[in-house]
């Protein structure tokens, strides 16, 4: 009887652990999949760098930022952040100015030209820009902290750690995959014409996001 109960409890715990992992994976993909400035930037760096490993500063920076936000969310910081309206205003203003500049830089990138080296981001610049597009987006931050933080409340102990680890793993895998996809895209686009269109569209996405932040600031 005792052995039977032990087996039953072990199976039950395994079920809840697997449920936490699957929940984390599905939730993280749902938050990270939509087209945004962060995704566009990582894809772009994968395409613009001569070798895929040269895009690692952007990938690592974005992944570390997401990891930090996820850890803070599970740690319960969402409650504090949501009680500080000034936080959203400051982040929105910073995001507005940064995205205007970032859009201008992206618009002027010319793939496969003599000036390509001039516009290729250095490792430090990649890391800084990736961190900026990750952290200067108040809505993305509040969504990540709020949704993941709230969802993590139903778990405790090992299940909470597994849920958090699953969310973090999805983030790293996704950004690595985006950079690889960008590199593959560049190998197909030998003329650079498609990449030029991608750059223009990327700049448009950044300016649209900046415009949204500007309207939100004005309305508030």
Curated annotation (Swiss-Prot):
Coiled coil: none annotated. It is a multi-pass membrane protein. GO terms for biological process: amino acid transport. It comes from the Bacteria. Keywords: Amino-acid transport, Cell membrane, Membrane, Transmembrane, Transmembrane helix, Transport. The chain crosses the membrane at residues 15-35, 67-87, 89-109, 128-148, 161-181, 195-215. One of its GO terms (cellular component) is plasma membrane. One of its GO terms (molecular function) is amino acid transmembrane transporter activity. The keyword Cell membrane applies. The keyword Cell membrane applies. It is found in: Cell membrane. InterPro entries: LeuE-type (IPR001123). Pfam families: LysE. Belongs to the LysE/ArgO transporter (TC 2.A.75) family. This is Putative amino-acid transporter YisU.
């Amino acid at each position: 009887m005792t052995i039977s109960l032990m087996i039953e409890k072990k199976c039950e715990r395994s079920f809840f652990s697997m449920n936490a992992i699957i929940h984390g994976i599905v939730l993280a993909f749902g938050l990270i999949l939509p087209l945004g400035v962060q995704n566009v930037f990582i894809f772009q760096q994968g395409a613009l760098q001569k070798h895929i490993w040269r895009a690692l500063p952007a990938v690592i920076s974005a992944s570390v930022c997401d990891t930090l936000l996820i850890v803070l969310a599970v740690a319960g910081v969402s409650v504090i952040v949501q009680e500080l309206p000034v936080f959203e205003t400051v982040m929105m203003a910073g995001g507005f100015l940064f995205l205007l500049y970032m859009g201008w830089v992206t618009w002027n990138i010319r793939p496969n030209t003599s000036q390509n080296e001039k516009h290729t981001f250095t490792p430090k610049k990649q890391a800084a820009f990736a961190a900026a597009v990750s952290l200067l987006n108040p809505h993305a931050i509040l969504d990540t902290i709020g949704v993941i933080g709230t969802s993590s409340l139903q778990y405790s102990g090992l299940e909470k750690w597994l849920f958090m680890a699953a969310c973090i793993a999805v983030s790293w895998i996704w950004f690595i995959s985006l950079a690889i996809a960008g590199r593959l895209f560049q190998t197909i686009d030998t003329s650079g014409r498609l990449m030029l269109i991608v750059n223009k569209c990327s700049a448009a996405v950044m300016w649209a996001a900046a415009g949204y932040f500007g309207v939100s600031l004005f309305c508030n």
